[in-house]
UniProtKB/Swiss-Prot annotation:
CDD domains in the cross-refs: P5_C, PDI_a_P5
Protein name, UniProt field: Protein disulfide-isomerase A6
Species in which this protein is naturally found: Homo sapiens
Keywords: Cell membrane, Chaperone, Disulfide bond, Endoplasmic reticulum, Isomerase, Membrane, Phosphoprotein, Redox-active center, Repeat, Signal
InterPro entries to which the protein is assigned, alphabetical: PDI_thioredoxin-like_dom, Thioredoxin-like_sf, Thioredoxin_CS, Thioredoxin_domain
Motif (Prevents secretion from ER): 437-440
Signal peptide limits: 1-19
Database matches in PANTHER family: PROTEIN DISULFIDE-ISOMERASE A6
Amino acid sequence: MALLVLGLVSCTFFLAVNGLYSSSDDVIELTPSNFNREVIQSDSLWLVEFYAPWCGHCQRLTPEWKKAATALKDVVKVGAVDADKHHSLGGQYGVQGFPTIKIFGSNKNRPEDYQGGRTGEAIVDAALSALRQLVKDRLGGRSGGYSSGKQGRSDSSSKKDVIELTDDSFDKNVLDSEDVWMVEFYAPWCGHCKNLEPEWAAAASEVKEQTKGKVKLAAVDATVNQVLASRYGIRGFPTIKIFQKGESPVDYDGGRTRSDIVSRALDLFSDNAPPPELLEIINEDIAKRTCEEHQLCVVAVLPHILDTGAAGRNSYLEVLLKLADKYKKKMWGWLWTEAGAQSELETALGIGGFGYPAMAAINARKMKFALLKGSFSEQGINEFLRELSFGRGSTAPVGGGAFPTIVEREPWDGRDGELPVEDDIDLSDVELDDLGKDEL
């Protein structure tokens, strides 16, 4: 099994990696400084790949993406964003895995996810299909270019997703909710509020889609709902406050553009997201997919069930789940297996010499790993992971230089282990007298 840690060539385990594209390619490199100008304000159709240099799938896509860019040159724009480097852009568009491809067509504020094949031909076909749709939209009177968002509440595509709150509805909707709320307190006559309105509306639709409704954007007319305005000390307009279950509201002091609002909302979503899954290694697909789709993959090898029983194993799993929650912002993968269940994995990582339980982390792209040498406890594992995230810790090459073979097995059923039952031997036909004579 392999764990994925951004690795280091010399002393450091984590290494800054160059992007996958260069200025000589037909793929246009996009960054936070040029994205709005190149893509959002453009009349062109854009295909944009969000990638991470360490991602194996991204590396395999690179030549096909370049091929498509060359074929579509001067017809459709093909770009790429190093989302590992430019977190804000990835977060703005809800990028959770790599590579993610989005098509920016007639409505640049609502890009579509590309779900097609990863070959140059499939990408070109999808681009031409999207281009045909863009032309149809223009024939039908829909704009294919940049929208400054000055239409106010006439922007029906996003108006519906801003939740209007009142003195009567606020507590039930916001304070009793498990969701995160961003609430704008406004005055209808306020010029700044009018400027914010279309940005807030567009952000509401995007945030609703990307967080599955877990972060909500709302608005309160503070000139009408004066109980709320007084309760939260509203003195100027617009004032935006963030409400989270069990916490005091805090002021939002970020930018007032759609992208700024969306970025903050996605940060809040990440903070409140459930911890990553802790998966048992029962086949090669789980092992490889978890490692290749995450920047870092953490694997624990727990003692045999006969050594710990269900209670002992569950106590180890609880520690791992707690740490997975603590490090969830890192977007790491978490795996576990039983001692002896994946022998090639243990051999490749040098696990077993220190006894069980054990833990390791691997940079799958460079096939290097770091081994937990401290105690397998919450404190010991936390120190190990913290050192890795700071780029410290010793590493070694994975044995064999390749992803270890993973054996398919049944998942743990959650119960105590049972010793194998020995078959009773039938001695009824044995002639004891004859045996005695033979021995003599």
